[in-house]
């Protein structure tokens, strides 16, 4: 069941004295029509809602419910510092149920604890700057991405064997979790699961 909306907050719900704050979708600094319609996250709104939860004596703990690929860097450092300082007042848990990447992981790292679903994705620690260059000498418009040197895997080149292999590592790891859980649920050995599932294909019910 959903919780009750916390008074004087934009996004916070409350269940059993625990404030749940969503960090969902792309992260931007300021709230606007796009963030309202698309369900993106504004660090400005998030910071205000976090403070409201901290100041409410009925709130015993805070959960940051994260499913975000990250977003704009502006405002993230201030928000993360606020979350880190909040740990001295109340327990702050970051739960990553889907994706907690880039700026979203920066936010999660400031919490007292990070809890992740086994199929969640986290990381992508690094910075990317994108620029579009246009003009006659460029034969039209070209987009460039500059990645911080500490994060060469943040934007892998799928046109290269190395890039495809790096993405394959993540896909294989997710596939291993999938197989392990199906094996547990059905009470069979993991090595039998791929064949049962036609090695990624589909079976009709009569043949399953």
How would you describe each model-predicted region?
Residues 175-207:
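Secondary-structure end/capping motifs
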Residues 95-101, 196-199:
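Glycine-rich beta-to-alpha transition loops that act as phosphate-gripper elements at the mouths
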Residues 111, 207-208:
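Conserved PDZ fold ligand-binding element
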